[in-house]
């Protein structure tokens, strides 16, 4: 099971008493800020949660799995996430639910 943006908005509505539209707008605005920062090359640091970083991957050789043909994999930027110590500790000390 995964937590969706709609579920986040619903939790804000329930926990903070926000109206549903404002909660949805808040979630969308938060993710838009993160997206814009990453697109412009900035690191995103969320205290107590973790960091979103950009990493440059250089071009490298690859292979088409169907044909076995050698193909180059283009250089690109990728987003990485490194959880903060507080998040790591909380996740490590929580029993998984099924």
Swiss-Prot record:
Q: Which InterPro entries match?
A: Hist_DNA-bd (IPR000119), Histone-like_DNA-bd_CS (IPR020816), IHF-like_DNA-bd_dom_sf (IPR010992), IHF_alpha (IPR005684)
Which Gene3D superfamilies does the UniProt entry name for this protein? Answer: IHF-like DNA-binding proteins
Q: Where is this region: Disordered?
A: 52-73
Tell me one GO biological process term: DNA recombination
The entry's keywords: DNA recombination, DNA-binding, Transcription, Transcription regulation, Translation regulation
What's an example of a GO molecular-function annotation for this chain? DNA binding
Q: Which domain of life is it from?
A: Bacteria
Pfam families registered for this protein in UniProt? Bac_DNA_binding
Disulfide-bonded cysteine pairs: these are none
The answer to whether UniProt assigns keyword Transcription to this entry is yes
Q: Does the keyword DNA-binding apply?
A: yes
GO cellular component annotations of the record: cytosol
Matching entries from CDD domains are given as:
IHF_A
Q: Where is the composition biased (Basic and acidic residues)?
A: 54-73
> HAMAP family, from UniProt?
IHF_alpha
User: Quaternary structure per UniProt?
Assistant: Heterodimer of an alpha and a beta chain.
Family of the protein in this entry: Belongs to the bacterial histone-like protein family.
Q: Read off the PANTHER family from this record.
A: DNA-BINDING PROTEIN HU, INTEGRATION HOST FACTOR SUBUNIT ALPHA
> What exactly does this protein do?
This protein is one of the two subunits of integration host factor, a specific DNA-binding protein that functions in genetic recombination as well as in transcriptional and translational control.
In Swiss-Prot or TrEMBL terms, this protein is called Integration host factor subunit alpha
> What is the species of this protein?
Pseudoalteromonas atlantica (strain T6c / ATCC BAA-1087)
């Amino acid at each position: 099971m995964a937590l969706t943006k709609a579920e986040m908005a619903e939790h804000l509505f329930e926990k903070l008493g926000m109206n549903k539209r404002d909660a949805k707008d808040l979630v969308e605005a938060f993710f838009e800020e993160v997206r814009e920062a990453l697109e412009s090359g900035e690191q995103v640091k969320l205290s107590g949660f973790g960091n979103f970083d950009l990493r440059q991957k250089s071009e490298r050789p690859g292979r088409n799995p169907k044909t076995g043909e050698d193909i180059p994999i283009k250089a690109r930027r990728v987003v990485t996430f490194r959880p903060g110590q507080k998040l790591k500790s909380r996740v490590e000390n929580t029993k998984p639910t099924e």
